[in-house]
A protein has these predicted regions:
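C-terminal regulatory/oligomerization modules of transcriptional regulators
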Residues: 1-3, 113-140
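N-terminal leader segment of winged-helix/HTH proteins
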Residues: 1-21
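N-terminal helix-turn-helix DNA-binding core of bacterial DNA-binding proteins
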Residues: 14-52
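Canonical helix-turn-helix DNA-binding module
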Residues: 41-78, 82
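Basic, amphipathic "hinge/linker" alpha-helix immediately C-terminal to the N-terminal HTH DNA-binding motif
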Residues: 76-94
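Alpha-helical linker/hinge and terminal dimerization helices associated
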Residues: 94-105, 137
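Leucine-rich, amphipathic alpha-helical/linker segments
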Residues: 106-114
Length: 140
């Protein structure tokens, strides 16, 4: 892609050539959040946490398993793999950095919706730079 040329969102997504979709990121991030909280990693818990049907959660878990992010058997517990943990920890970190940023900018305590809408479109370098900016501004 030409660096200064405009493309559609789909064009940027295709050029990124990533295996994990934005929806998969949401599921993996939630699995890692549930694991941090000590909650069981089961289809019904995941579905409830994301406000989706268990069948939708089960299908997405199959996709994540196919990419090596998780292991699970139908009707069994979900286990996040090392690969999944690495990516999931980054997703949680990215979420936290953006949440701090939006709360500071908007002077609020909760910017969940804002973060959820934008987090998938921020690359690692931008998240890192934003984190450094927040640190320089004394925003923790």
């Amino acid at each position: 892609m030409e660096p200064s040329a405009f493309y559609t969102m789909k064009g940027y997504e295709l050029a990124a050539d990533t295996q994990i979709t934005t929806a998969m990121e949401d599921y993996l991030e939630m699995l890692c959040r549930l694991q941090r909280e000590g909650r069981p990693l089961r289809v019904n818990v995941l579905a409830e946490s994301l406000h989706v049907r268990p069948s939708s959660a089960s299908k997405m878990l199959g996709n994540l398993k196919g990419l090596g992010y998780i292991d699970f058997q139908k009707y069994g517990a979900v286990e996040v793999t090392e690969k999944g943990l690495r990516e999931g920890e980054y997703l949680l970190h990215r979420h936290q950095v953006l949440h701090r940023f939006f709360c500071a900018v908007n002077g609020t305590e909760d910017e969940l919706e804002q973060v959820e809408k934008i987090e998938h479109f921020m690359n690692r370098e931008t998240v890192n730079n934003l984190e450094q900016l927040l640190a320089r501004m004394g925003i923790r």
